[in-house]
Amino acid sequence: MPRVIDLFCGCGGLSLGFEKAGFQLVRAFDNWDKAVNIYNKNFIDHKAELKDVHDLTVEYLTAFQPDVIIGGPPCQDYSSAGQRDESKGRADLTLRYAELVCGVKPKWFVMENVDRILKSQTLPKAIKSFKDTGYALTQVVLDASRCGVPQKRKRFFLIGESAGRDCFLENALLNDQKSDRMKIRVYLGDKFGTELYYRHPRSYARRGIFSIDEPSPTIRGVNRPIPGTYKIHAGDATEDLSKVRPLTTLERARIQTFPRDFFFEGGKNDLEQMIGNAVPVELAAYVGRHLLDYMNEKINTPEIALEQLAFNFH
């Protein structure tokens, strides 16, 4: 199995998805002690280290002999929830991720972020680093609800292959998305615990009441009760607030497609942030499966055969 290192692992959504897809995680890193604790309670064949990426060295990472480096650099400086400001410091973590990848030079890498990173000043700098190092790149924005996750959550993926061809995975990732969005009831069944729930909107111009017969809106790092001043929105799933409640922390984890046996412990606010920051497990698995299929196809179809096939068509 391809060996994987996860930078910015959090509580393990991206790692678990890649493990589910058939990769072997050999090491993970994060600088949040509470997330590392949860990670290590759930993964037994490798460990996460409490370490800031600025303290990691190329030599240390290279010793793990990774075939793939994955990671989702913290995205608050790009996200609408964080009032995008690249001067805050988190945006440079994307460049640090690129610096480490380009130093270690694994055959492949996968970087995840919010789709707003496409409008950032940081992404072109990271892309230049990857291209200068010889990576071919696939850039896609995926809708999690079309990739097996009962949640509307658009995420950007930058996937690199050393000495490959640009857009090598784009068609497979985009074309395999489902036409129907995954609904909570379809994914979790009738035993979810509630038919209707409240998710605090960013502004009262947006609705806040949803049904499990639709995908959830994006699970964020905050979870608030229904305010007494809430006014019914035209798009709300019901006008009867007596039938509505906020989701519990574990219900939010299930919508993020963490399995029921994934262990969580700690304070509510920390867990809400941890779960909201995670890459949905099934979205990570979707990307991982397509990458692994591509890897296996490359092994079974040597480059010389591909070049000969192309020559024969001319």
Predicted regions and their residues:
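The conserved SAM/SAH-binding core of class I Rossmann-like methyltransferase domains
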Residues: 28-29
